[in-house]
Regions:
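A short tyrosine-centered beta-strand micro-motif
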Residues: 128-134, 256, 345-347, 549
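Short beta-strand segments within Ig-like beta-sandwich modules, predominantly Fibronectin type-III
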Residues: 106-109, 235-241, 321-327, 529-534, ...
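Short strand-turn-strand beta-turns centered on an Asx-Gly dipeptide
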Residues: 229-230, 712-721
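Ligand-binding face of N-terminal immunoglobulin V-set domains in extracellular IgSF glycoproteins
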Residues: 116-120
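Contiguous segments within soluble domain cores/interaction surfaces
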Residues: 30-52, 57, 63-64, 68-108, ...
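Surface-exposed, low-complexity/disordered segments
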Residues: 45-49, 60, 64, 85, ...
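Bacterial Sec-dependent N-terminal signal peptides
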Residues: 1-37
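Internal, hydrophobic beta-strand segments that form the core of beta-sheet-rich folds
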Residues: 72-73, 130-138, 348, 851-855
Length: 866
């Protein structure tokens, strides 16, 4: 039996392998085996490591300072969109416009669902575009782009309560810490080209998709032509939907330009450079309902090769064929697409080395969704009226569906336009890259216009969620994280100086719940365990705790304490993503008006001065006034100003700050990154905020600088006087005594806590910020861990709040301006697929807006949007 026959029979388990040979050229056995090896690796990878996806349904489309953000999480497997049985823990994070995580929830996944909320009351607060992202730790194995991310405008609290026509955001956010890469405005007109398959091939016709956008990323309609050196037209093009379109072009060695006329002005753009050798790869997904029409063509400079074509969808291999391409003519064939699942499929053309020569994304099928009927008991409602809503859910066959609904009812007045749904996210947005203006439009109809526009979208914004080089075994894949089964803690014991792993040492852990330290013997509030590190010095444990717990870890070897360091694997959150300019726009429902944020100001650079000379000049000025003594008596005065309440002063100071740090958490984070700061507060500040740095005077005195000027430290909101004892008092504080730190650049705040003998001019010349240190009460200061001991904390599952529903059977005296009238993340339908809710209106809504989403156990999606 020949090897080829053996392959045909042996890999019949795949059920879809077939060979295409142009002009009956045979396929060598050695090449067939190599191509099949990549496909086998691809299939096994998909089975062994299926991916997960996350979708969040939110209660509203925008928020104001002080609002609650409510959300329902759906965690599914990518293959069938069914509730995941893998990961049991979901991380949901709220990031401010600068990319700082201001709140985080750790939620237990049960039957693929969990729920939570954030409160927009953190300090310091500044309005802008906030990001909510969600992921399982297991998802991070496949890249940060797999993380669910949604951007919301968060507006300043309106001047008049309930005036939601006022949509103001911070116009100068650059003064706040910026961890997010800055969004930059583009040219007036931008034209980008995307050859089908990935590249232009010399002397071969290639379909080229393109996208035209303005400076803010908005799609624009243009028409134009391709001009050669002689300015002759070799091809023409025109946008079809949302600034996108496709034209066919044969590239050669000549330099060509694309010319368009927009707003009565001509613009010229360069096309991608053509490859001297290669294969053009074209996929027609529109002409034949049940097949993919594929065309492969090489040019005369490209040697004949045996190639493979793989068809994947949702992380699973669905089809594979081999073909020999020897002649410089197009070769076309068809692949059946009836067995492909609804959604995005990826076709890959690859060679015997496993290298991708070309690939293409296509959308196959029509979503088979649930039917959701929603009815209100009245057409119009009065203030504080009782609102009744009925729901009925049926499967695609018309049978009642018993499922859990996430339901949001809102006062839709001046509502920001919603652009997403579970359907668009799970089937489309999670498979492509970049911003899509209105993804729901592509699912409004199954006609030629919508199908062609969706095909062009995938040619322009195609992103490979499933990395070929890893799946096919071309490059090794590192599995960093297994699906978590609870609150997992992983760590490593290393030597103090050289950070060498310490195997076979004992790690003792002691957990006590925050606030329950006085009951260490209570099994519900404390836990004790002992582990032994493996050959790499690693250890781990799993728990199901809720809330925040104190954790003490100690290291011993043969019964003796060892001065080793314990590093915990808790720094795994993704980097904040860069916003596109198109995302930073607000569309009001039913209105095309767009609000744009102001461009961020560039950071100001300040000149440094010799601080010792400045202080000396200041002291000399005091002596001239006869104030060289430490204590001075003044005549009796009458103070007429009203004294500011201390609590009010503290709150006001916090609101004007630009950054907040929980010092214990920050120190833990530094240690988890295998860093060391000892008791140096300057080192702590530098680690927490990159704007801080050290400067040394000629006399060797160390100063901390911030954005070009010195830093003023104030402890517990008390003034800092310019004398040796008071000015350096902050450096004597043990870091364990510091509860939190606020940074303020507000000039009034700096003056409030600076030495009152300084003039405002001197203060402005001297200080750039004030670091406000808040300390623990003396009896609450933690004792520093001893030899081989690490005192830290364990974050358990977050405590979930319930949405508040007011009872207006007795009318209230005050107005009610709630924007979210009703939120239920888990409303259950009965056996007839029906459910009913009743709640009270606010003081002005007439026509509530309703959004309902659901996902059944077999992966059927249901969406209702009003």
């Amino acid at each position: 039996m020949s090897l080829r026959k053996f392959i045909r029979r042996g890999i019949g388990l795949l059920g879809f392998l077939w060979f295409v040979s142009v002009y009956a050229y045979p396929i060598p056995d050695s090449i067939a085996v190599r191509l099949q090896g990549f496909v086998s690796a691809l299939e096994q990878f998909g089975k062994a490591l299926p991916q997960e996806k996350v979708y969040l349904h939110f209660d509203n489309t925008s928020y104001y300072q002080g609002d609650q953000i409510w959300f329902q999480c759906y965690v599914v497997t990518s293959e069938f969109n069914r509730p995941t049985a893998w990961s049991k823990t979901l991380y949901v994070e709220l990031l401010n416009p600068g990319g700082e995580i201001v709140s985080r929830q750790i939620l237990p996944i049960r039957n693929g669902r969990c729920q939570g909320n954030f409160t927009l009351t953190h300090l310091p607060f500044y309005s802008g575009f906030y990001e909510v992202r969600a992921y399982t730790k297991y998802m991070l194995n496949f890249g940060e782009a797999t993380v669910f991310s949604r951007i919301f405008p968060v507006f300043d609290k309106p001047d008049s309560e309930g005036d939601y026509t006022q949509k103001e955001i911070c116009r100068h956010p650059g003064k706040y810490p910026q961890k997010r890469e800055k969004t930059r405005k583009e040219k007036k007109l931008n034209l980008r080209f995307y050859p089908e398959g990935g590249t232009l091939i010399r002397d071969v016709p290639v379909r080229v998709a393109f996208e035209a956008t303005d400076a803010f990323g908005n799609p624009v309609d243009v028409s134009g032509c391709i001009l050669n050196k002689e300015k002759e037209v070799v091809s023409t093009f025109r946008t079809s939907h949302e600034g996108k379109g496709v034209f066919t072009y044969v590239a050669d060695t000549e330099e060509v330009k694309a010319e368009v006329v927009w707003r009565d002005k001509k613009y010229r753009f360069s096309l991608p450079e053509a490859e001297e050798q290669g294969f053009a790869f074209s996929v027609d997904n529109l002409s034949i309902p049940d097949s993919l029409a594929i065309t492969v063509q090489k040019n005369r400079f490209t040697a004949a090769q045996v190639l493979g074509v793989a068809v994947m969808s949702r992380g699973k291999l669905y089809n594979f064929c081999m073909l020999t391409v020897k002649r410089n003519q197009p070769f076309s064939f068809r692949l059946d697409k009836k067995n492909l699942p609804v959604g995005v499929s990826q076709l890959v053309l690859f060679d015997k080395a496993g290298q991708v020569l070309a690939d293409r994304l296509v959308f196959v099928g029509k979503p088979d969704t649930l039917s959701l009927a929603v009815r209100t008991d009245k057409e119009q409602y009065l203030p504080y009226d009782s609102i009744g809503i009925s729901f009925e859910v049926n499967d695609p066959q018309g049978q009642p569906a018993q499922t859990l609904l996430s339901v949001s009812v809102r006062d839709g007045r001046e509502e920001v336009e919603s652009r997403h749904s579970m359907l668009t996210d799970l089937l489309l947005m999670s498979e492509i890259k970049g911003y899509v203006r209105r993804p729901s439009w592509y699912f409004e109809s199954d006609d030629t216009l919508h199908r062609r526009a969706l095909d062009e979208l995938l040619m322009v914004q195609g992103w490979r969620r499933y990395e070929w080089k890893h799946w096919a075994g071309v490059e090794p894949f590192e599995l960093k994280y297994l699906p978590e089964q609870g609150i997992e803690l992983h760590g490593q014991v290393v030597s103090m100086v050289r950070s060498k792993p310490r195997p076979d040492v004992q790690v003792t852990s002691f957990l006590t719940k925050r606030g329950e330290e006085d009951n260490p013997t209570d099994q519900n509030t404390s836990c004790f365990d002992v582990f032994t590190t493996d050959s790499s010095g690693r250890f781990s444990f799993i728990s199901q705790v809720e809330g925040k717990w104190n954790l003490i870890l100690s290291v011993s070897e043969k019964g003796k304490k060892k001065d080793h360091r314990i590093v915990l694997d808790r720094v795994f959150h993704p980097e904040p993503r860069r916003y596109s300019m198109a995302e930073l726009q607000v569309h009001i429902s039913g209105d095309e008006k767009v609000s744009l944020p102001d461009t961020q100001l560039n950071d100001t650079v300040f000149m440094q001065e010799n601080m010792e000379q400045l202080f000396k000049a200041y002291e000399d000025s005091l002596r001239k006034l006869g104030m060289d003594e430490k204590i001075h008596r003044i005549d009796e005065v009458v103070v007429k100003a009203k004294k500011l309440d201390k609590a009010a002063e503290v709150y006001k100071t916090r609101t004007k700050s630009i950054a907040y740090y929980d010092v214990a958490s920050e120190m833990d984070d530094i240690q988890d990154r295998n860093g060391f700061i000892g008791d140096d507060i300057h080192e702590l500040m530098i680690n927490m905020n990159s704007e801080f740095y050290r400067e040394h005077s000629p006399g060797g005195q160390e100063y901390l600088f911030y954005k070009g000027r010195m830093v003023l430290f104030a402890i517990n909101y008390e003034r800092t006087y310019h004398n040796e004892m008071d000015y350096n008092k902050y450096r004597l504080l043990p870091l364990e005594a510091i509860k939190s730190v606020y940074i303020s650049e507000d000039f009034g705040t700096i003056c409030r806590y600076a030495d009152p003998r300084f003039t405002p001019i001197n203060i402005d010349k001297l200080y750039r910020c004030v670091v406000l240190i808040e300390t623990y009460p003396e009896d609450q200061i933690s004792v520093k861990g001893g030899k081989g001991v690490r005192k830290t904390w364990l974050e358990g599952y977050s405590e979930v709040k319930d949405f508040y529903q007011p009872d207006y059977r007795v009318l209230p005296k005050e107005n009610d301006y709630r924007r979210t009238l009703y939120w239920n993340p888990a409303l259950s339908t009965d056996e007839q697929g029906k459910a009913y809710i009743r709640f009270y209106n606010n003081s002005r809504c007439k026509y509530p807006r309703i959004t309902v989403e659901t996902l059944t156990e077999d992966g059927k999606i249901g969406v209702f949007r009003q």
